């Protein structure tokens, strides 16, 4: 069994995927961070950021859909969340222990990959759990912006599903194919300044929206080259 980072490197080499991330070098490795990012890809973005966090901090954890536990080489870094039923006691304990620990944690507050609305690709409304966890754990929040989008086909399927009133995210079935479509690409990611949760104002929803706004403002700070 390969270590998670080695598995990621082999996968990216075979897919000819590369990325550049700016801003992590400004962060104190001794701090406890909760990284929050937009979610354009539904898997690939998590692997890129996880690789960068392991490189910078030595290890990391990523909050993911529990279906990704089937990717066995990455199980050590996953914090699985059951989005289709009750969370198991083992998963809940793993989640709590990670937030109580010191390793950096990455989460995608949208909970699913971005969708297209009015011609603009952006996250669906963010869930509030990351704000609650940041306050409870005393972790500083680091916003991350990931450049990228999926195919027009994926967004059309998602829109059709919504128009038909189907609640199940059937477009998820195309995510593996969408990931392989990204082969040969280079991506840009940028990290913002840490945000102390105690410095956020308003309701939990307002606080989450503030952080989301910071994430999307980082688009203006993407490095000029990939």
Locate each region found by the language model.
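Membrane-anchoring hydrophobic helices of lipid-metabolizing enzymes
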Residues: 1-39, 44-48, 57, 75, ...
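Short, flexible loop segments at the rims of nucleotide/cofactor-binding pockets, characterized by
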Residues: 10-16, 81-87, 119-120
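Short gly/ser/thr-rich secondary-structure transition/capping motifs
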Residues: 15-21, 87-89, 171-173
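Structural motif
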Residues: 34-36, 80, 106-108
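Short beta-strand segments
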Residues: 37, 63-64, 108, 145
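"Short basic amphipathic alpha-helical interaction patches in structured regions
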Residues: 47-53, 121
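Conserved nucleotide-cofactor-binding alpha/beta core module
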Residues: 54, 58-100
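Non-catalytic C-terminal accessory region of glycerolipid acyltransferases
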Residues: 91-226
